[in-house]
Structure formats: structure tokens, C-alpha cells
Amino acid sequence: MAAPRTSTRKFLGRLSLPERNFVAEALRTETVGGVLLLLAAITALIWANVPALHHSYESVSHFHFGPAPLGLDLSVQHWAADGLLAVFFFVAGIELKRELVAGDLKDPKAAALPVAAALCGMAVPALVYTLTNLTGGGSLRGWAVPTATDIAFALAVLAVIGTSLPSALRAFLLTLAVVDDLFAILIIAVFFTADLNFAALAGAVIGLAVFWLLLRKGVRGWYVYVPLALVIWGLMYNSGIHATIAGVAMGLMLRCHRHQGEEHAPGEHIEHLVRPLSAGLAVPLFALFSAGVVISGGALGDVFTRPETLGVVLGLVVGKAIGIFGGTWLTARFTRASLSDDLAWPDVFAVASLAGIGFTVSLLIGELAFDGDPVLTDEVKAAVLTGSLLAALIATTLLKLRNAKYRALCEDEERDEDSDGIPDIYEQDNPAYHLRMAEIYERKAAEHRRLAEVTGGAGAENDGPA
């Protein structure tokens, strides 16, 4: 009796056309935002480190404004971290909801791999940080700093070095970042919540309930939701829970599955409107007022000698790469999934290294973890910048080694010889596509025959005696 066949499931294979189009559109905006984020970080470092400009940077960052009776007389730096990042986490909430109802996280089998990779990619950096500080006698408060991935910064690196990742690897990186954001949100909510103001928290919950009810009733109009969102955010801030949680909660409430006849779900439409605001304004401004740490030779030396900062660097550079790669490899092994024929395991390790760029959320968690110790906060920020830079350099080297292969795969994914707007690789099972291609090649063949006859005739006339 023949042994039963064991089927192997492919992962990191070709995306469906709708998923490919969604990933391409989402990452296009994130790439532009990532370049702006990179420029904002560089501007912050220059502004904070040029002696003639340093005082103005400190003055602007610590300038307070806002309604004091409402508990919102905040510095510019706090408005950026607590206010603008709420927009970023609102988009993250929509992304997570979409992944859960229509993306890779909808199917438990398909979700197992990116979720396991993301979990390992957070657990191992936290473990690396903890072991480094237990050995060196440092503070364990920053264990969560190296656990985050900054998708926008990673895409900016790809844009700068001119590397074209295949859509499957880009989708894998995007899903990793979405799951990362989810657990970062949970970490912020659970471990960095101050003394609770239950009255404000109750008000925020009631506001969220009203927000949900209006969505379910189909009420439309930004003039309804924007003021309500601001009220919810203000109440959440005063409750003691980090205000960005309000953005996530509202994002998760949006409907991201399409009803019959709908071209876009409401969540997709709102994400399309808000993502440019998040990527192009909110996150770069946060970087501008958070990345401005004073860098000196001594400070850079301390990054590699102080246990807290060394733990952050090792967590981002070593922990992220080993965690994501190890989680992916182990999950594939135990679920009997096989890697796509077009890719190799070094490609997964390169993407895992790229995920070690943990800029935005790592800076935020660093501020929360070491609140009250401005010197250590700045040192940890410098460690985040250093670790992200090292991770980017390692990923750049690894990706460049495979760039020719990636370029060929991207060209295959984008080729559209029949000019119908759909890449040819997605039409191989469509008879109409092959008929169109046959007509195209027949026209080309007829043209070549005509040219051959003309050339042959001219040659025959010139073959006669001089």
C-alpha cells in the first residue's frame, strides 16, 4: 500500500493581484513618508548638535501650549509623541483590522508564520537586552525598546540604496510590522500606564462606544468623527493610559471588509486619506522632536559600554535578525511549509536584519521607559539611532548581494506585454490573455516578414554586376 502523500504549503510565494496592488499602494506612501522621516531625523541631529542652533532646538521642543484647565498644557515634544503619534497608531489599527479580516492574518495557517516570526522578533531582542543588563548590572526598564520595527524607515533605506524587493518579501515585512505594532501597543498599554483616572477612562470608553455606534449606524461626515476623536483622545490622555491607545481603538472599529457593490470598505477609504497625513507629517514631526540627541565622541562610546544602551543596540542588530529568522525557520519546519522556489533563506535573513530598524516606536518606548531620567533617555535614543543604522548597513549589504535576482523577479511581476493593466504573470490561466498575445506576436511576425522581404529585395537588386 502506498504511503499517503504529505502536501507542503509554500510561503513567501506570489501574492494575489488585489493583495499585490494593496501592498504596492500602501508601501508607496510609506516609502515617501520614510524618506521624510529620514530627513527629519537628520535635521533633528543637526539642529541639536550645532552649537549655534542647540538652544533654539531645546526652546522649541520644550515650549508649552494647550488648554491647561483640560490637563493638556503640553510641550511641543509631548504633543508630537502623544498627539501626532495617535494618528500613526490610528492607521496601524486600520492596518491590523484589515489584515485580520482580509489579509494574511485572516487564515490561521497563513497567519502562523508572520505572527510567530514577529513574536520571536520581539521576544529575542527583549531577552538580549535583559541578559545584557543582568550581566552588566543595568536597568531592566528598557527591555521593550528594541522590540519594535519601523516599516517606513526600512522602506526609506530600500529607496535610498535602490533595492527592489519582490512583493512577497515586501508583504512579509509589512505584516511583520503590523503584528509588531499590535504587540507594541499592548506593551505600552500594559507596562507604561500611569496611575489611572477612572473618571477620564470611563469618559473615553463612553466616547469610543459612541464612535462605534455612529459607525454601525452608517453616519458619515468628518465634522462628526474628528471632534469626537479629539474628545476621546483628550480623555484617554488624562486617564493615565497612553493617548495613542485611543487612535488604535478607533482604527480597529472601522469596517475593513467590503459589502456587495462596494469598491472600497470604509476602513480602506479612510486609511487612504489618513495614511499620507501619518507618514508625511505626524511621524516626521515626531522624529524631528525626538531624535535630536546631542552626539559626541564620548556619548557614542557610552552606547557600547553602558549596559542599557548596549542592550538596545544588540537587541536591534542581533536579536531582531535572529528572532525573526529563527521564528520563520522553526514555523516553516513544524508546519511543513516550504520556501517559494524564487527565494532562498538568505533572503529571509536579509529582511529580518532590515526589521532591526526600530526607530519611531522604539524612541517612544525609550521615552516612556526612562521618563524622569533625561540623561539616560537621550543615551537610549542615541542607542536606537546607532542600532537602527547598523541594522540598515547590514541589511543593505545582504540585499545588495541578491539585488540582480530581486530585479529580475520584480520585472517578471510588472511585465504587461498586452498592455491591459494586469501583469502577465497573473493571466497565465486566462485564455483571452493568450489570444491577445497571439495577435500581438502575429502582428510582429507579419512586420518582420515585410521587413525581410524589403531587405531581401534591396539585397537582390544590389547583387547584380557593377
From Swiss-Prot:
Subcellular location(s) of the protein: Cell membrane
Main location as per UniProt: membrane
One GO term of the biological process aspect: regulation of pH
TM stretches of this protein: 32-52, 74-94, 111-131, 142-162, 172-192, 195-215, 221-241, 280-300, 310-330, 348-368, 379-399
InterPro entries: Na/H_antiporter_dom_sf, NhaA
Pfam family, one: Na_H_antiport_1
Topology with respect to the bilayer: Multi-pass membrane protein
Gene3D superfamilies cross-referenced by the UniProt entry: Na+/H+ antiporter like domain (1.20.1530.10)
Record protein name field: Na(+)/H(+) antiporter NhaA
Name of the gene encoding the protein in the UniProt record: nhaA
